[in-house]
């Protein structure tokens, strides 16, 4: 699903929620929350281009500036930590400011292409500009040994609607927009390929349910889809190139909210 379709779903969902009668038992007041869980990142189809010409050597031709490059990165399951400060209205709506952090490791890279040609089977010297040798590993063998990680930190403004069920159990849906920084470190086979960060606008869609423990506390579980509106663009250290890294992720979390003045 592309960004336009997701934004349309947000708008449609907001309109539908506005038509739901307000929960008679909803109480108004501020709250704070803390949650944690697992981050399930999508694979990243990294893409970029050389920003300078790689000179020719006796064994390999030059790689001109603006030549495309890319590869696929698969990630491990990671973790998520979130903190919220919000305000609940008596009509079922809530608004909140959320700080969100996720971190996950790199499993493997594969399918490195330069100018559209896959070079996984080529001597790694094509990238290091060293001399090819029978004992050298291939590009594919070097990048298959993942190593590295991606950390994301975001600040979001969220809007939720708690659905009144007439009990202490309340399903909810929500959406948020904000800004997210991605810190990308790629070190396949211990080679320092990338270590940089980049920020950009981001959005998230949420659904879950809460259960009241008391008048002041409630437990909640939540699913979140979070992504940026663009890729995280990071400069490469091994090559004179920039790479766009995708940061879309599902997050499954559980936490507690403490209510004040309600």
Report residues per predicted region:
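Cleavable N-terminal export/targeting peptides
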Residues: 1-28, 261-262
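Short sequence motifs at beta-strands and strand-loop junctions characteristic
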Residues: 65, 69-80, 147-154, 197-202, ...
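Short glycine/proline- and aromatic-enriched beta-strand/turn motifs that initiate or cap beta-hairpins
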Residues: 22-87, 184, 257-262
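C-terminal or late-domain output modules
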Residues: 164-261
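Solvent-exposed loop segments that connect transmembrane elements
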Residues: 44-70, 110-145, 187-195, 230-245
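Gram-negative (and chloroplast) outer-membrane scaffold detector with strong preference
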Residues: 27-29, 38-42, 84-187, 247-262
């Amino acid at each position: 699903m592309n960004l336009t379709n997701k934004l349309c779903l947000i708008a449609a969902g907001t309109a539908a929620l506005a038509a739901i009668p307000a929960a008679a038992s909803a109480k108004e007041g501020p709250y704070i929350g803390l949650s944690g869980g697992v981050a399930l990142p999508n694979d990243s189809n990294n893409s970029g281009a050389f920003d300078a010409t790689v000179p020719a050597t006796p064994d390999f031709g030059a790689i001109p500036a603006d030549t495309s490059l890319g590869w696929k990165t698969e990630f491990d399951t990671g973790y998520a930590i979130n903190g919220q400060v919000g305000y609940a209205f008596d009509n079922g709506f809530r608004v909140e400011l959320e700080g969100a952090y996720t971190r996950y490791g790199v499993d493997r890279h594969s399918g490195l292409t330069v100018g559209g040609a896959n070079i996984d089977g080529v001597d790694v010297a094509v990238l290091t500009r060293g001399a090819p040798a029978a004992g050298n590993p291939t590009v594919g063998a070097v990048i298959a040994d993942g190593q590295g990680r991606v950390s994301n930190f975001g600040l979001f403004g969220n809007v939720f609607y708690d659905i009144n069920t007439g009990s202490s159990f309340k399903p909810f849906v929500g959406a948020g927009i904000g800004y997210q920084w991605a810190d990308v470190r790629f070190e396949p086979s211990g080679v320092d390929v990338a270590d940089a960060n980049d920020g950009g606008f981001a959005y998230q869609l949420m659904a879950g349910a809460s259960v009241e423990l008391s008048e002041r506390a409630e437990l909640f579980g939540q699913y979140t889809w979070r992504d940026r509106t663009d890729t995280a663009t990071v400069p490469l250290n091994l090559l004179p190139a920039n790479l766009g890294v995708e940061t879309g992720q599902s997050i499954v979390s559980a936490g507690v909210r403490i209510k004040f003045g309600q």
